[in-house]
Amino acid sequence: TAEGKPFFWMGDTAWELFHRLNREEATSYLKNRADKGFTVIQAVVLAELDGLHTPNAYGEVPLENDDPTKPREAYFQHVDFIVRKAAELNIFIGMLPTWGDKVFKAQWGTGPEIFNTENARGYGKWIGNRYKNDKNIIWILGGDRNPRNETDVAVWRAMAAGIEESVGREKALMTFHPQPNGVQDGGSAKWFHQDDWLDFNMFQTGHCREILLWDRMEYAYNLKPVKPVLDGEPIYEDHPVCFNANELGTSSAYDVRRAAWFDVFAGAFGHTYGCHDIWQMYAPNRTPVNGPHLPWYLAVDLPGAGQMKFLRNLIESRPMFERVPDQTLITDALTVSDRIQATRGNDYIFVYSSVGKKFTVNTGKISGNEIISHWYNPRNGEVKENGKTRKGPQQEFVPPTSGYGHDWVLVIDDASKNFKRPGQK
C-alpha cells in the first residue's frame, strides 16, 4: 500500500470498466468487489471493444483523432472518478493504459494501431503524470498481445519509460499482460525479465481446463533476477471452455477455484479471478462477445467470485512472506486432473487436493515436535479440526469427501505456535 503495508493481490478482471459503465454502475460494481474481499481491479483506459471510437457512458471518446498525444479531458474525468472511488474502498486499480490491439491489432483485434515509440512515451508520460498522486495505481502494460517483433518491444519500453519519467522509478509498480505462451517463456519474462521497469512477471494461462499452471509458475518463480509472479488471466468463470462451449461446456466455480489454488500454492504472490460476463460488462443492450450468459450486474454474485476470499483469508491467516512452494512435502502429486499442490512456511504447511484424493505429507519439514491439522473447505471457508499428532516423515491424510468438485485444503501447523483457526484474521 501507499503506507508500505503489504497486501494480498486478490484481483478481478473488469477490462471494460472505464469504457462501458457509468458512475453509478461503476460504484455498485466496486462496492460488490470490496465486500467480496477483492483488492485489485484490472481495467483498461483505451479499451478493447472499439474503445477509441465507441464512446463511454457519457458520449466521450478518449483521444482526438486517435492521437495518443491528444487525450480528451472529459473521458479521463470519468476514469479519475472510478480510480478515486476504488481508493475510497481500499481497492487498487491494475491500470492498462491501452489494450494491446492499439500496438498490434492481430487478426481478431479492433485496433487501430496508433502507437509508435515516440507517442507511446508521450502518452505514458501524460497518463503517468495524471495519476502520479493516486496511491492505488498498479501499471499493467500489454493487454492480451505478445510483441510480434523488436519494434513492438520498443513501443512498450517507451511507454514504460514515459510512465516512470512522471511517476518515478521507485513509485511506478509495473508489469505486462501477455497472451498465453510456453512454460519456458515465463509469461512477460520472455521479453522484459531483464528490464528494470518490470517489477513482477504476469502470465495469461488462458481459458482451457487442464493447463499445467504449476510448471509455468515454477519456471518464472526460479528466474534470475528474482521477480514475483502472478497469473493475470486464468480460466474465467462462465466462459466457454477452450472457446468451445458446444463440446466442452462452460467453466464453473470449481474451474476458477482450481486455477487460483494451484497458482498460489505453486508460487504466485496473489491471483486474478475473471468472469466472462464481467470483463466485457455485458448487458442486454450490448453486443455479446463469445456467448456470455448473464448481465454483469447479476454475474458479480456467481459462486466462484464469492469463494476467492477463502483463498485470501487462508493465506493471510499465516505468516505469508515466508511461504514458499514445496512439492517435496508430498510423495505423489498425481496427474493434471487430480493434482495435489503443496506450499509451506517455517511453521505451517498447506496442501490442496483438487478432487479430494488422499496423500502423504512429510510433516518433518516445519518447526516443532507436535503438529495440529485442519481441513479447510475452499467452497465455503469451513474448518474441520483433525487434532494433534507427533511430526513424522510419512503421514497420510484423507480429505473428508472426494470426487469432481470436492477440493480440500489441508492445513498443518506447528502446535506450539497457537495460530488462529485457518482463515481467521
Q: Which sequence ranges carry the predicted segments?
A:
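A short, sequence-level motif marking secondary-structure junctions
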Residues: G11-E16, K365-S367, R390-G392
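Aromatic- and carboxylate-lined catalytic core of secreted/periplasmic carbohydrate-active enzymes
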Residues: K5, P228, E237-H239, S252-K388, ...
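Active-site mouth of glycoside hydrolases
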Residues: A2-L212
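Structured core elements
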Residues: Q42, Y58-E60, L230-D231, T272, ...
